[in-house]
């Protein structure tokens, strides 16, 4: 999936769950803000929205007994581990990796739970 320019959520990333779609928008906004204002505070804010979203999404999956929950949680943990190594100012290649990861994760992994939560 191509990284949208400007980097922003659009309807092609809609999961049909309003709360998840709203949180996905915050992930796009967090990475975009980090690319524009590459500060320690922005990095911490970006990490925080990812942690909160993954917690919320995984909670919804667990509640629905989603069959791919463990696998999906592992993918989230892998991303957070990579993000945990980022230091401000974050290298552009790392921000680009985060953007590419997000635009691929939603349609390949998150879309698997459409209609199942």
From Swiss-Prot:
Lineage: Eukaryota, Metazoa, Spiralia, Lophotrochozoa, Brachiopoda
InterPro entries according to UniProt: Haemerythrin (IPR002063), Haemerythrin_Fe_BS (IPR016131), Hemerythrin (IPR050669), Hemerythrin-like (IPR012312), Hemerythrin-like_sf (IPR035938), Hemerythrin_metal-bd (IPR012827)
Gene Ontology molecular function terms on file: iron ion binding; oxygen carrier activity
Coiled coil: none
Protein family (similarity comment): Belongs to the hemerythrin family.
Originating species: Lingula anatina
Keywords on record: Iron, Metal-binding, Oxygen transport, Transport
Annotated Fe cation 2 binding sites: 57, 72, 76, 105, 110
Gene3D superfamilies per the UniProt record, alphabetical: Hemerythrin-like
Superkingdom: Eukaryota
Protein name, as recorded: Hemerythrin subunit alpha
């Amino acid at each position: 999936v191509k990284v949208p320019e400007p980097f922003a959520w659009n309807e092609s990333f809609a999961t049909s769950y309003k709360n998840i779609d709203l949180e996905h928008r915050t992930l796009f906004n967090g990475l975009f803000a980090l690319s524009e204002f590459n500060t320690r505070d922005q990095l911490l804010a970006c990490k925080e929205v990812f942690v909160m979203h993954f917690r919320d999404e995984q909670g919804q999956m667990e509640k629905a007994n989603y069959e791919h929950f463990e696998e999906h949680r592992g993918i989230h943990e892998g991303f957070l581990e990579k993000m945990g190594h980022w230091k401000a100012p974050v290298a552009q290649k790392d921000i680009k990796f985060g953007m590419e990861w997000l635009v691929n994760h939603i349609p390949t992994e998150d879309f698997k739970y459409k209609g199942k939560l």
